[in-house]
Amino acid sequence: MKTRKLFALLAALAFVLPAMAQGNYKNFKVSMYARAYEVDKMADQHWLDSTWTIISSQLKVDKIYLETHRDLLIVPDATLEKAKKFFASKGIETAGGITYTINEANNFETFCYSNPEHRALVQRIAEHTAKHFNEFILDDFFFTSCKEDGEIDAKGSKSWTEYRLEKMTEAGKNLVIDPAKKVNPKVKVIIKYPNWYDHFQGLGFNLDKGPKIFDGIWTGTETRDPGSAQHLQNYLSYNIIRYFNNLAPGRNGGGWVDAGGINMSMDRYAEQLHLTMLAKAPEISLFAYHQLCGIGLQSSWRAPWQDLGNTSWNYDKIVAPFKDAKGNTITPSTMAVITDRVLHQTDELMGKLGNPVGINSFKAFHSRGEAFLQNYLGMIGLPMEMLPSYPTGKKVFLLTAQAANDPDLASKIDQQLRTGNDVVVTSGLVKAAQDKLSTICELQVNDLKAMVNDFGRHGKSERDILIPQVLYYTNDSWEVVSAGRPLNGGTSGYPILHRALYSKGNYYVLTIPDDFGQLYDYPRAALKEIRRVMSQDLDVYLDAPSKVSLFLYDNKTLVVENFNDTPVEINLVTEPGIKTMTNLLENEKIQGELQAGGWRQPKENFFKVILPPHTYKAYSYK
């Protein structure tokens, strides 16, 4: 009898456990982060019940991170255990979280990691958290901006970057990881890296050593409003996941989005969620509990382009009353409903997409120069795949000023070109590493500038663009795309895309405007030629204006997304052998039109697609 009961139990578990593992979404997990301020309030059962009802009636969540400390508020043991028990009763997985700030409102005031009292408190918080959880995550602020007298003295003759990299790596191991594991040997300590990766080294985030000492990493994919403090481009929400996946393969837990940018429109918030998942993040964490239950729906989030009626996210449908599983009518009240609808819609697509592929771009650890440039390139339709090491086996790769300090820079380029492949470097890299690169081609980029708006046969820009002048020897290298003011009938012209022959390969220089945002002003035909040159490893490239991005996958699928406020007509360009594209969500087929390529270029197939504002479409091709 006992044997039969055991087998029956095992059979039941075999059925139930996969369903539990699957959660509320088919292709990823959705979690939520609760700040210490809100976790502390969870001691009040009424507050906990009422706020959870607001969220859970509109949004399906699989997991919650309960923060134990922020701004010197340490949540008591009893409150943490009560919250854990409450969410377990709802079928929600729990983990811990720590924000190491002294006063977030005071310019994100951080701990001073040479201060003995601060160090003791940092350790005590880690031990307190490990007591309650088998996993906890460090929110954005495990860095230091402290410049108190003691910290200045401790730095000595080192640069701030050198000192902080060493200090925060030491603090991570000795104050957080080791003490936590001594309290709870099962605990996994995860570090969440924020979205400002190109500035990490200056505040102590060590992307070389950090991912090796922590049990895992997480990725900040918040891009919010590009006009606000960090000026991050939409594409970063995708690009940073890919970069961190390449930093720590198999150990990047997911992406992290907050409500920032929703003031622009519902679509700006939706894009951050959507792009995070397009990068194939296994989980997304929503910051935060107080926003999801407290930020009410606002009519101003309904952008004017919603009147077109065929955008990817329909505001009116998303906020309309709906029936829950029990047949009750739910009237949406907060941003939580937008989150749920966008993620479920994205979930329907994700299972059809393979692994992301893109144009390889090397970024050296702790490098400076042309910060965040790859995100601007992503916004002009160049699919980016950033790597912490040099790409191998590629027909072409991109090097920016972030490669300037590599002592092997010229030899790596030489190797690539000798194998009959190509390299694209930016004007910023030529300026930063002019002497090294002169062994490849004697180009100069100094402080000379040019104002351009006429790209000749490649069109005109609507605004003047300030570019660095790339100087070269006549007949040693050649302009592929040129610009002047004017160029046709003008007096001067300057390279936008430049080409030099070297061994069996092509060495290209891409001119980057002083203001990276003016890449968006490059005419469509100029962008098409840049994409053609840089997309040699890819099956598809774009013929489109700027602010249209392309996402490619290794199973011959793609997503193309319009970030403009107006509709665009674009072409997906392929070699002639690709005949048909099929819409992954609507099963509509489009046929390619064979057209002549550029000067001395073979014919190509053009697949016409019309994209409404802030809208994506997905296709398979063969």
Predicted regions and their residues:
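Boundary at the C-terminal end of the N-terminal hydrophobic targeting segment
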Residues: 19-23
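A conserved amphipathic helix/loop scaffold
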Residues: 375, 384, 388, 400-622
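Bacterial N-terminal signal peptides
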Residues: 8-18
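Active-site-adjacent "subsite" loops/lids of carbohydrate-active enzymes
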Residues: 25-50, 79-134, 140, 144-149, ...
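Structural motif
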Residues: 33-38, 67-70, 98-99, 139-142, ...
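Hydrophobic targeting/anchoring helices
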Residues: 62, 106-110, 126, 134, ...
